[in-house]
Amino acid sequence: MVLDSLGRALSNALKKIARAGSVDEALVKEVVRDIQRALLQADVNVRLVLKLTKEIQRRALEEKPPAGISKKEHIIKIVYEELTKFLGTEAKPIEIKEKPTVLLTVGVQGSGKTTTVAKLARYFQKRGYKVGVVCSDTWRPGAYHQLKQLLDPYHIEVFGDPNEKDAVKLAKEGVEYFKTRDVDLIIVDTAGRHKEEKDLIEEMRMISEEIRPHEVILVIDGTIGQQAYNQALAFKEATPIGSIIVTKLDSSAKGGGALSAVAATGAPIKFIGVGEKIDDLEPFDPARFVSRLLGLGDIQGLLEKFKELEKEVEFTEEDIDRFLRGKFTLKDMYAQLEAMRKMGPLKQILRMIPGLGYSLPDELISVGEERLRKFKVIMDSMTEEELMNPEIINYSRIKRIARGSGTSIKDVKELLTQYNQMKKFFKSMNKRQLSRLARRFGM
């Protein structure tokens, strides 16, 4: 989970209010101290922390709750509102207005820029845009091959020449090339060789003059914490069309510091990197981000995940009729497990469900994820006939499947039990109920 330790600490602070018999000044001050401690441990700037928590305390002690809202609920709302304001208030998506729209990405060495370019290309491809990627990184020989390796499986074309040494020429040629390929979006990757902001900005200016991008994106490493302020500020002052992506928020205790530092400059954060996989890039929406961080869920985010799934897994009316007649196969179950895997880590999905927040132990979530992985491995060891007709799987077949998948007989039996329960569940539903469920879960 992104900023897991910060989220838990903030969620625990709010629980003190929710569980208290009554709310007085002493409790408010105690909760404010907890919030201060949590933010400082996430490497948020001291001055920013004090300013934020002073406002939370003032509002919590002075404001009267509106009619129908309890004092506890009002204070939780205040914390949510102030944290959202702290991180930028509203979402600022990248807009594809012209065809082609050109995005130029820059970033210092080690920021995760090249991987982020691939994630960005995949993000827009999933939303129906035709994307072309230009590799103008002449400094790192492996950059072009890295982009090819990441994007070839998704049939996203990469333009580049590992032998060319002129980055500006390469960027210009790449943009001109994709203008003839009828793409909607061109993303230009640059060299990440600069350690200092001024060198980075100079290269950005040179390439910008040649390719005239619609937007310039600075990729910032979330692990640098509040040091991100200087990078973001220098960048914001250098270009009026700049936006920011903060990476590696899944692996850093300093991610809160990086996010708040960038937000403090006023530079718009467009996306955040939340994992290593190519789909682990999220549009940054402060309100939804804070809601998840506080354990309050993100229903909109969950619905968007389901919407993405609709394109990945399609079950027809005939399939639904078949399920209702009890003709649900292991192959159908496999398709559902694949769909769940594509939604992202189980922990990330569970955090989107209101009320669940941080209540499930990590160990339990890990067991759930491991179980889903194991089920897929077991089904990969089955024959087509067994997947289509699970009823033929007798004890000798179970032994063979267990041996072939490197699992135990007990694991195979557990999968078959789970399958039979799902089959029974579908058979017990009427067509309208199942159609509604199918639409919701991308079936």
From Swiss-Prot:
Catalytic activity reported: GTP + H2O = GDP + phosphate + H(+)
A single cellular component GO annotation: signal recognition particle
EC top class named in words: hydrolase
Entries under SUPFAM superfamilies matching the protein: Domain of the SRP/SRP receptor G-proteins, P-loop containing nucleoside triphosphate hydrolases, Signal peptide-binding domain
Keyword Ribonucleoprotein attached: yes
GO BP, sorted A to Z: SRP-dependent cotranslational protein targeting to membrane
Keywords, comma-separated and alphabetical: Cytoplasm, GTP-binding, Hydrolase, Nucleotide-binding, Ribonucleoprotein, RNA-binding, Signal recognition particle
Binding site for GTP: 107-114, 189-193, 247-250
Chief location of this protein within or outside the cell: cytoplasm
Highest taxon, organism lineage: Archaea
E.C. numbers: 3.6.5.4
Record's keyword annotation contains Cytoplasm: yes
Family named by the database record: Belongs to the GTP-binding SRP family. SRP54 subfamily.
Comment on protein domains: Composed of three domains: the N-terminal N domain, which is responsible for interactions with the ribosome, the central G domain, which binds GTP, and the C-terminal M domain, which binds the RNA and the signal sequence of the RNC.
Name of the protein this chain belongs to: Signal recognition particle 54 kDa protein
Organism: Pyrococcus horikoshii (strain ATCC 700860 / DSM 12428 / JCM 9974 / NBRC 100139 / OT-3)
Lineage of producing organism: Archaea, Methanobacteriati, Methanobacteriota, Thermococci, Thermococcales
Gene name of this polypeptide: srp54
